[in-house]
A protein has these predicted regions:
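Alpha-helical transmembrane segments and their juxtamembrane interfaces
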Residues: 19-20, 53
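A compositional/structural signature for long, glycine/proline-rich flexible linkers
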Residues: 28-408
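Bacterial N-terminal signal peptides that target proteins for export
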Residues: 2-15
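C-terminal motif of bacterial Sec signal peptides marking the signal peptidase cleavage site
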Residues: 22-25
Protein backbone atom coordinates (compact mmCIF):
# COMPACT_ATOMS: atom_id res chain seq x y z
CA UNK A 1 0.00 0.00 0.00
CA UNK A 2 1.42 3.38 -1.01
CA UNK A 3 1.71 6.30 1.38
CA UNK A 4 -0.80 8.22 -0.74
CA UNK A 5 -3.31 5.37 -0.43
CA UNK A 6 -2.82 5.26 3.33
CA UNK A 7 -3.43 9.00 3.55
CA UNK A 8 -6.55 8.73 1.38
CA UNK A 9 -7.94 5.93 3.52
CA UNK A 10 -7.16 7.99 6.60
CA UNK A 11 -9.16 10.85 5.12
CA UNK A 12 -12.09 8.69 3.98
CA UNK A 13 -12.71 7.35 7.49
CA UNK A 14 -13.86 10.87 8.44
CA UNK A 15 -15.49 11.67 11.76
CA UNK A 16 -18.57 10.26 13.49
CA UNK A 17 -21.70 12.39 13.78
CA UNK A 18 -21.91 14.53 16.87
CA UNK A 19 -25.24 16.24 16.22
CA UNK A 20 -28.14 15.46 13.94
CA UNK A 21 -28.44 17.52 10.78
CA UNK A 22 -30.77 20.27 11.99
CA UNK A 23 -32.38 21.30 8.70
CA UNK A 24 -34.64 18.28 8.53
CA UNK A 25 -35.90 18.58 12.07
CA UNK A 26 -36.83 22.23 11.73
CA UNK A 27 -40.50 23.18 11.59
CA UNK A 28 -39.88 26.75 10.44
CA UNK A 29 -41.08 27.63 6.95
CA UNK A 30 -37.69 29.31 6.47
CA UNK A 31 -36.11 25.85 6.26
CA UNK A 32 -37.70 25.26 2.85
CA UNK A 33 -38.17 28.80 1.54
CA UNK A 34 -35.79 28.81 -1.46
CA UNK A 35 -35.06 32.53 -1.18
CA UNK A 36 -34.10 32.25 2.48
CA UNK A 37 -32.07 29.06 1.93
CA UNK A 38 -30.21 30.66 -0.98
CA UNK A 39 -29.39 33.79 1.02
CA UNK A 40 -28.11 31.80 4.00
CA UNK A 41 -26.03 29.50 1.78
CA UNK A 42 -24.45 32.50 0.06
CA UNK A 43 -23.63 34.24 3.33
CA UNK A 44 -22.27 31.05 4.88
CA UNK A 45 -20.09 30.25 1.89
CA UNK A 46 -18.48 33.69 1.83
CA UNK A 47 -17.72 33.31 5.54
CA UNK A 48 -16.36 29.78 5.08
CA UNK A 49 -14.29 30.35 1.93
CA UNK A 50 -11.00 31.51 3.52
CA UNK A 51 -11.24 28.72 6.10
CA UNK A 52 -11.62 26.18 3.30
CA UNK A 53 -8.68 27.66 1.39
CA UNK A 54 -6.54 27.59 4.52
CA UNK A 55 -7.45 23.96 5.14
CA UNK A 56 -6.61 23.10 1.52
CA UNK A 57 -3.09 24.41 2.10
CA UNK A 58 -2.83 22.68 5.48
CA UNK A 59 -3.77 19.40 3.83
CA UNK A 60 -1.12 19.83 1.14
CA UNK A 61 1.65 20.97 3.45
CA UNK A 62 1.02 19.33 6.83
CA UNK A 63 -1.53 16.53 6.67
CA UNK A 64 -0.13 14.80 3.60
CA UNK A 65 3.36 14.69 5.10
CA UNK A 66 2.35 14.52 8.77
CA UNK A 67 4.66 17.45 9.45
CA UNK A 68 2.84 19.29 12.23
CA UNK A 69 4.94 21.04 14.87
CA UNK A 70 8.20 21.04 12.93
CA UNK A 71 9.72 23.60 10.61
CA UNK A 72 9.90 23.02 6.88
CA UNK A 73 12.54 25.35 5.49
CA UNK A 74 12.80 26.40 1.87
CA UNK A 75 16.42 26.12 0.78
CA UNK A 76 16.20 28.22 -2.36
CA UNK A 77 14.18 31.20 -3.51
CA UNK A 78 10.85 30.30 -5.05
CA UNK A 79 10.42 30.13 -8.80
CA UNK A 80 7.82 28.87 -11.29
CA UNK A 81 7.93 25.38 -9.79
CA UNK A 82 6.39 26.60 -6.53
CA UNK A 83 2.61 26.32 -6.70
CA UNK A 84 1.46 25.87 -3.09
CA UNK A 85 0.40 29.48 -2.50
CA UNK A 86 -0.52 32.07 -5.13
CA UNK A 87 1.69 35.15 -5.56
CA UNK A 88 4.72 33.76 -3.70
CA UNK A 89 7.65 36.08 -3.19
CA UNK A 90 11.13 35.71 -4.68
CA UNK A 91 12.85 37.73 -1.95
CA UNK A 92 12.72 35.62 1.20
CA UNK A 93 13.17 32.01 2.20
CA UNK A 94 10.00 30.62 3.73
CA UNK A 95 10.10 28.69 7.00
CA UNK A 96 6.73 26.98 7.32
CA UNK A 97 5.47 25.69 10.66
CA UNK A 98 2.00 24.18 10.90
CA UNK A 99 1.03 24.06 14.57
CA UNK A 100 -1.27 21.50 16.15
CA UNK A 101 -2.11 23.09 19.50
CA UNK A 102 -4.75 20.67 20.72
CA UNK A 103 -2.55 18.97 23.32
CA UNK A 104 -0.33 21.86 24.42
CA UNK A 105 1.31 25.11 23.31
CA UNK A 106 4.45 25.33 21.20
CA UNK A 107 7.54 27.36 22.11
CA UNK A 108 9.51 28.96 19.27
CA UNK A 109 13.06 30.27 19.73
CA UNK A 110 14.64 32.61 17.20
CA UNK A 111 18.22 33.94 17.17
CA UNK A 112 19.41 37.50 16.87
CA UNK A 113 18.96 38.62 13.24
CA UNK A 114 20.39 42.11 12.81
CA UNK A 115 21.48 42.29 9.18
CA UNK A 116 18.25 41.60 7.29
CA UNK A 117 14.47 41.52 7.39
CA UNK A 118 12.72 38.55 8.97
CA UNK A 119 9.25 37.89 10.32
CA UNK A 120 7.04 35.15 11.70
CA UNK A 121 3.38 35.62 10.83
CA UNK A 122 0.80 33.71 12.87
CA UNK A 123 -2.37 32.90 10.90
CA UNK A 124 -5.39 31.32 12.57
CA UNK A 125 -8.05 29.09 11.02
CA UNK A 126 -10.16 32.10 10.07
CA UNK A 127 -7.07 33.48 8.23
CA UNK A 128 -6.67 36.33 10.71
CA UNK A 129 -3.06 37.43 11.22
CA UNK A 130 -3.37 37.32 14.98
CA UNK A 131 0.31 37.88 15.86
CA UNK A 132 3.75 38.72 14.49
CA UNK A 133 7.30 38.26 15.68
CA UNK A 134 10.23 39.74 13.80
CA UNK A 135 12.09 42.84 12.71
CA UNK A 136 9.11 45.21 12.89
CA UNK A 137 7.30 43.92 15.97
CA UNK A 138 9.75 42.28 18.37
CA UNK A 139 13.08 43.62 17.11
CA UNK A 140 16.34 42.10 15.98
CA UNK A 141 17.47 40.41 19.19
CA UNK A 142 17.02 36.76 20.12
CA UNK A 143 13.42 36.03 21.08
CA UNK A 144 11.34 33.24 22.59
CA UNK A 145 7.60 33.19 22.03
CA UNK A 146 4.84 30.70 22.73
CA UNK A 147 1.67 30.00 20.75
CA UNK A 148 -1.29 28.45 22.59
CA UNK A 149 -4.65 27.14 21.46
CA UNK A 150 -7.98 28.52 22.65
CA UNK A 151 -8.50 25.95 25.40
CA UNK A 152 -5.09 26.08 27.06
CA UNK A 153 -5.08 27.03 30.72
CA UNK A 154 -1.60 27.39 32.10
CA UNK A 155 1.25 29.64 33.12
CA UNK A 156 3.68 31.21 30.69
CA UNK A 157 7.30 30.34 31.59
CA UNK A 158 9.32 33.30 32.85
CA UNK A 159 11.83 33.21 29.99
CA UNK A 160 9.11 33.19 27.31
CA UNK A 161 8.77 36.81 26.24
CA UNK A 162 5.56 36.67 24.18
CA UNK A 163 2.39 34.59 24.46
CA UNK A 164 0.16 34.49 21.38
CA UNK A 165 -3.24 32.82 21.79
CA UNK A 166 -5.08 31.46 18.76
CA UNK A 167 -8.83 31.16 18.30
CA UNK A 168 -8.35 27.72 16.74
CA UNK A 169 -6.49 24.47 17.32
CA UNK A 170 -4.36 24.79 14.18
CA UNK A 171 -2.09 27.70 13.26
CA UNK A 172 0.19 28.50 10.36
CA UNK A 173 3.40 30.15 11.55
CA UNK A 174 4.93 31.47 8.34
CA UNK A 175 8.51 32.67 8.58
CA UNK A 176 10.20 34.85 5.97
CA UNK A 177 13.93 35.60 5.97
CA UNK A 178 15.28 38.00 3.34
CA UNK A 179 17.95 36.87 0.88
CA UNK A 180 20.18 39.05 -1.27
CA UNK A 181 20.69 36.73 -4.21
CA UNK A 182 23.17 39.13 -5.81
CA UNK A 183 25.59 38.78 -2.88
CA UNK A 184 27.80 35.70 -2.92
CA UNK A 185 27.23 33.49 0.11
CA UNK A 186 24.10 35.28 1.32
CA UNK A 187 21.83 32.32 0.66
CA UNK A 188 24.13 30.13 2.75
CA UNK A 189 23.99 32.73 5.53
CA UNK A 190 20.19 32.51 5.57
CA UNK A 191 20.31 28.71 5.62
CA UNK A 192 22.43 28.98 8.77
CA UNK A 193 19.90 31.34 10.35
CA UNK A 194 17.07 28.95 9.53
CA UNK A 195 18.78 26.14 11.41
CA UNK A 196 18.63 28.31 14.53
CA UNK A 197 14.84 28.59 14.36
CA UNK A 198 13.67 26.03 16.92
CA UNK A 199 10.26 24.78 18.00
CA UNK A 200 9.32 22.53 20.93
CA UNK A 201 6.12 21.51 22.70
CA UNK A 202 5.85 23.34 26.01
CA UNK A 203 6.39 20.11 27.97
CA UNK A 204 9.65 19.38 26.13
CA UNK A 205 10.81 22.96 26.62
CA UNK A 206 10.22 22.59 30.38
CA UNK A 207 11.56 19.03 30.54
CA UNK A 208 8.20 17.67 31.70
CA UNK A 209 6.08 14.66 30.78
CA UNK A 210 3.96 15.50 27.74
CA UNK A 211 0.17 15.51 28.04
CA UNK A 212 -1.92 12.87 26.30
CA UNK A 213 -2.26 13.56 22.56
CA UNK A 214 -5.60 14.44 21.03
CA UNK A 215 -7.83 11.44 20.38
CA UNK A 216 -9.00 12.94 17.07
CA UNK A 217 -6.46 12.09 14.38
CA UNK A 218 -8.57 11.78 11.24
CA UNK A 219 -9.25 14.73 8.97
CA UNK A 220 -11.81 15.10 6.16
CA UNK A 221 -10.25 15.58 2.72
CA UNK A 222 -10.36 18.84 0.83
CA UNK A 223 -11.72 18.16 -2.66
CA UNK A 224 -12.25 21.12 -4.96
CA UNK A 225 -15.49 19.93 -6.54
CA UNK A 226 -17.06 19.27 -3.15
CA UNK A 227 -15.65 22.49 -1.70
CA UNK A 228 -17.58 24.43 -4.36
CA UNK A 229 -20.88 22.61 -3.81
CA UNK A 230 -23.27 21.97 -0.92
CA UNK A 231 -20.75 19.36 0.24
CA UNK A 232 -18.56 22.19 1.54
CA UNK A 233 -20.72 22.08 4.66
CA UNK A 234 -19.20 18.80 5.88
CA UNK A 235 -15.71 20.29 5.86
CA UNK A 236 -16.89 23.63 7.23
CA UNK A 237 -18.63 21.89 10.14
CA UNK A 238 -15.42 20.04 10.94
CA UNK A 239 -13.47 23.31 10.94
CA UNK A 240 -16.04 25.03 13.16
CA UNK A 241 -15.46 22.23 15.66
CA UNK A 242 -11.79 23.22 15.84
CA UNK A 243 -12.24 26.90 16.67
CA UNK A 244 -13.75 29.05 19.36
CA UNK A 245 -16.65 30.94 17.83
CA UNK A 246 -16.35 34.62 18.64
CA UNK A 247 -19.31 36.02 20.61
CA UNK A 248 -19.94 38.52 17.82
CA UNK A 249 -20.49 35.66 15.36
CA UNK A 250 -22.48 33.18 17.44
CA UNK A 251 -25.85 34.47 16.23
CA UNK A 252 -24.67 34.27 12.62
CA UNK A 253 -23.42 30.68 13.01
CA UNK A 254 -26.73 29.76 14.62
CA UNK A 255 -28.51 31.24 11.59
CA UNK A 256 -26.34 29.08 9.34
CA UNK A 257 -27.81 26.11 11.22
CA UNK A 258 -30.86 26.51 8.99
CA UNK A 259 -28.91 24.73 6.23
CA UNK A 260 -27.11 22.22 8.45
CA UNK A 261 -24.09 24.22 9.53
CA UNK A 262 -22.71 24.02 13.04
CA UNK A 263 -19.66 22.81 14.98
CA UNK A 264 -19.36 19.07 14.42
CA UNK A 265 -22.75 18.68 12.71
CA UNK A 266 -23.00 15.79 10.27
CA UNK A 267 -24.32 17.00 6.92
CA UNK A 268 -25.98 14.53 4.55
CA UNK A 269 -26.61 16.13 1.16
CA UNK A 270 -28.54 13.08 -0.05
CA UNK A 271 -31.39 14.04 2.28
CA UNK A 272 -31.91 17.44 0.70
CA UNK A 273 -35.07 18.14 -1.25
CA UNK A 274 -34.30 19.15 -4.83
CA UNK A 275 -35.68 22.65 -4.30
CA UNK A 276 -33.56 23.16 -1.19
CA UNK A 277 -30.43 21.79 -2.83
CA UNK A 278 -30.93 23.93 -5.92
CA UNK A 279 -31.38 27.03 -3.78
CA UNK A 280 -28.21 26.24 -1.83
CA UNK A 281 -26.22 25.63 -5.02
CA UNK A 282 -27.46 28.94 -6.43
CA UNK A 283 -26.35 30.72 -3.27
CA UNK A 284 -22.90 29.11 -3.43
CA UNK A 285 -22.54 30.01 -7.12
CA UNK A 286 -23.42 33.62 -6.36
CA UNK A 287 -20.94 33.65 -3.48
CA UNK A 288 -18.14 32.37 -5.72
CA UNK A 289 -18.99 35.00 -8.32
CA UNK A 290 -18.92 37.78 -5.71
CA UNK A 291 -15.58 36.52 -4.38
CA UNK A 292 -14.19 36.44 -7.92
CA UNK A 293 -15.36 40.01 -8.56
CA UNK A 294 -14.41 41.45 -5.17
CA UNK A 295 -11.46 43.41 -6.57
CA UNK A 296 -12.95 46.88 -5.94
CA UNK A 297 -13.22 46.01 -2.24
CA UNK A 298 -9.56 44.99 -2.09
CA UNK A 299 -7.94 48.06 -3.58
CA UNK A 300 -8.31 51.36 -5.39
CA UNK A 301 -7.25 52.05 -8.98
CA UNK A 302 -4.72 54.79 -9.69
CA UNK A 303 -2.66 55.19 -12.88
CA UNK A 304 -3.45 51.59 -13.89
CA UNK A 305 -2.23 50.25 -10.53
CA UNK A 306 -4.34 48.58 -7.86
CA UNK A 307 -3.35 50.03 -4.50
CA UNK A 308 -4.17 47.54 -1.80
CA UNK A 309 -6.50 48.42 1.05
CA UNK A 310 -6.41 46.67 4.42
CA UNK A 311 -7.39 43.16 3.34
CA UNK A 312 -5.37 41.16 5.88
CA UNK A 313 -5.21 41.70 9.61
CA UNK A 314 -6.26 40.52 13.03
CA UNK A 315 -9.83 39.93 14.14
CA UNK A 316 -10.38 43.50 15.25
CA UNK A 317 -9.14 44.88 11.93
CA UNK A 318 -11.12 42.43 9.79
CA UNK A 319 -14.26 42.16 11.91
CA UNK A 320 -17.35 41.73 9.76
CA UNK A 321 -15.47 42.13 6.46
CA UNK A 322 -16.23 38.62 5.28
CA UNK A 323 -16.27 39.28 1.54
CA UNK A 324 -12.98 41.18 1.80
CA UNK A 325 -11.47 38.30 3.75
CA UNK A 326 -12.70 35.82 1.13
CA UNK A 327 -11.52 37.93 -1.79
CA UNK A 328 -8.10 38.33 -0.18
CA UNK A 329 -7.81 34.57 0.30
CA UNK A 330 -8.64 34.05 -3.37
CA UNK A 331 -6.21 36.73 -4.53
CA UNK A 332 -3.27 35.71 -2.34
CA UNK A 333 -3.89 33.86 0.90
CA UNK A 334 -1.55 34.59 3.83
CA UNK A 335 -0.83 38.14 2.79
CA UNK A 336 0.71 40.42 5.39
CA UNK A 337 -0.83 43.26 7.33
CA UNK A 338 -0.42 46.72 5.82
CA UNK A 339 2.02 47.52 8.62
CA UNK A 340 4.23 44.62 7.50
CA UNK A 341 4.04 44.79 3.71
CA UNK A 342 2.31 46.65 0.91
CA UNK A 343 1.21 44.99 -2.32
CA UNK A 344 0.42 47.32 -5.25
CA UNK A 345 -0.18 45.42 -8.48
CA UNK A 346 -1.11 45.99 -12.10
CA UNK A 347 -2.39 43.93 -15.00
CA UNK A 348 -2.46 46.72 -17.59
CA UNK A 349 -0.25 49.30 -19.22
CA UNK A 350 -0.61 53.08 -18.92
CA UNK A 351 -3.24 53.07 -21.67
CA UNK A 352 -5.39 50.49 -19.92
CA UNK A 353 -4.50 47.63 -22.26
CA UNK A 354 -3.83 44.23 -20.62
CA UNK A 355 -0.15 43.38 -20.12
CA UNK A 356 0.64 40.75 -22.74
CA UNK A 357 4.18 39.77 -23.67
CA UNK A 358 3.12 36.84 -25.84
CA UNK A 359 3.12 38.96 -29.00
CA UNK A 360 6.64 40.25 -28.55
CA UNK A 361 5.66 43.39 -26.66
CA UNK A 362 8.08 44.86 -24.14
CA UNK A 363 7.27 47.01 -21.14
CA UNK A 364 9.37 49.39 -19.04
CA UNK A 365 8.68 50.49 -15.47
CA UNK A 366 10.80 53.55 -14.72
CA UNK A 367 11.67 55.04 -11.33
CA UNK A 368 13.66 58.21 -10.87
CA UNK A 369 16.16 57.95 -8.04
CA UNK A 370 13.97 60.22 -5.92
CA UNK A 371 10.90 58.06 -6.49
CA UNK A 372 12.29 54.67 -5.52
CA UNK A 373 10.08 52.94 -2.93
CA UNK A 374 11.00 53.90 0.63
CA UNK A 375 11.49 51.18 3.21
CA UNK A 376 12.49 51.11 6.87
CA UNK A 377 15.82 49.77 8.10
CA UNK A 378 16.32 46.13 7.03
CA UNK A 379 13.21 46.38 4.85
CA UNK A 380 13.19 45.77 1.11
CA UNK A 381 11.12 46.32 -2.03
CA UNK A 382 10.75 44.25 -5.16
CA UNK A 383 8.68 43.78 -8.30
CA UNK A 384 7.65 40.26 -9.24
CA UNK A 385 5.89 39.07 -12.40
CA UNK A 386 3.12 36.44 -12.24
CA UNK A 387 1.09 34.73 -14.93
CA UNK A 388 -2.70 34.96 -15.12
CA UNK A 389 -5.04 33.55 -14.07
CA UNK A 390 -2.88 31.18 -11.99
CA UNK A 391 -0.79 33.90 -10.28
CA UNK A 392 2.49 31.99 -10.22
CA UNK A 393 5.93 33.08 -11.40
CA UNK A 394 6.76 32.93 -15.09
CA UNK A 395 9.52 30.68 -16.41
CA UNK A 396 12.09 32.61 -18.45
CA UNK A 397 15.52 31.97 -20.03
CA UNK A 398 17.52 34.03 -17.51
CA UNK A 399 15.77 32.63 -14.42
CA UNK A 400 15.01 36.09 -13.07
CA UNK A 401 11.67 36.43 -11.32
CA UNK A 402 11.95 39.73 -9.45
CA UNK A 403 13.77 43.06 -9.47
CA UNK A 404 14.29 45.29 -6.47
CA UNK A 405 16.53 47.19 -4.11
CA UNK A 406 19.07 44.35 -3.97
CA UNK A 407 19.33 43.87 -7.76
CA UNK A 408 22.73 44.73 -9.22
Amino acid sequence: MTKATQILQRFITLFLPIFLFPLFGCSSNNATDPAVVKAVAKEAYIFAYPMLENYKTMQAQALSGDSFNSFTHATHLQGPEYRDIVRPNNDTLYSTLWMDLRAEPLVVQIPSVTDRYYSFQMVDMYTHNFAYAGTRTTGTGARTFMVAGPNWKGTTPENVEDLFVSEGNFVLCLGRTAVNSDVAGDLERVLEIQQQYRVQPLSAYLGQTPPAPSSMNVFPPYEKDKAESVEFINLFNFLLGQVVIDPSEKEMIQRFGLIGIGPGYLFDASRLDDSVRNAMEEGIAEALEEIKNSGPLLGTEENAWTLTKRIFGNREQMQGQYLVRAGAAAMGIYGNDLEEAYYPSTQQDMHGAPLDASGGKSYALIFSREDLPRVKENGFWSITMYDLPDQFMVENPINRYSLGDRTN
